[in-house]
Regions:
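Short glycine-rich anion-binding loops that position phosphate/pyrophosphate groups of nucleotides
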Residues: 38-39, 93, 141
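A phosphate-binding catalytic loop at a beta-strand-loop-alpha-helix junction
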Residues: 83-103
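Generic alpha-helical structural context detector
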Residues: 102, 119-122, 142-143
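Short glycine/serine- and small hydrophobic-enriched flexible loop segments
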Residues: 106-107, 146
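Catalytic cores of secreted or luminal carbohydrate-active enzymes
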Residues: 124-159
């Protein structure tokens, strides 16, 4: 579903009031909400504190280490009572939500292949059969399937950044170019720097 909006977003998204009313009417005491916009949190008391949060950036794939815990949480809740349902949302309720729902379909072996699971999601979620369309997000569904089929657990490794290389720097009109770099790890700011290059310096360096 789309993000349950509280302020101006209610004009073009699901309102919090309408979302709560729907869940209370059809699934009272038997629903859990999964928020994939962790930094856009809301008061969980709207949903009687039945909210779990997983942070994912818009238009990005999830971190692999989040996919299995999400699937386990969904599966445990659904298995606890046959009346239980889960409501998963990001912003529009399509890309990030689709990745994690497809991961869960992989988790329960709903279809044999990641492609079949993503095709199924596209059919039941959208009117134009365009569900999970961003290549990196689709790729992570395949990654998760690979881990599941081989009973592997993903463990994040320590990485060392030793350089940044521009293979094709931008060619813009103007005398100077500004390059900026922002480094973050797990949404924690690490380092930032920027510098200017003249058109001639850029030509000689690259």
């Amino acid at each position: 579903m789309g993000f349950p909006a509280i302020d101006q977003e209610k004009i073009y998204r699901n309102s919090m009031e309408a979302t709560v009313a729907f869940l209370e009417r059809y699934h009272a005491d038997h629903y859990m909400v999964f928020n994939l916009r962790g930094r856009h949190a809301y008061d969980p008391s709207y949903f009687h504190n039945r909210v779990m949060t997983f942070e994912m950036d818009d238009h990005h794939p999830p971190r692999l280490e989040l996919m299995a815990p999400f699937c386990r949480a969904v599966h445990d809740y659904l298995a606890a009572d046959e009346q239980n349902v889960v409501a998963v949302h990001c912003k529009a309720g399509k890309g990030r939500t689709g990745v994690m729902i497809c991961a869960y379909l992989v988790y329960i072996n709903f279809y044999c292949s990641p492609r079949q699971n993503m095709d199924y999601y596209s059919i039941v979620r959208t009117v134009n059969n365009k569900g999970v369309t961003i290549p990196s997000q689709r790729r992570y569904v395949y990654y998760f399937s690979h881990l599941r089929k081989r009973n592997l657990n993903y463990m994040p490794l320590r990485c060392e950044l030793i350089g940044v290389y521009f293979e094709r720097p931008p060619r813009l009109n103007g005398l100077y170019f500004e390059f900026s770099f922002v480094f973050c790890f797990n949404y924690i700011f690490i380092f930032f720097f920027s510098f200017f290059l003249s058109h001639m310096e850029l030509f000689h360096k690259f």
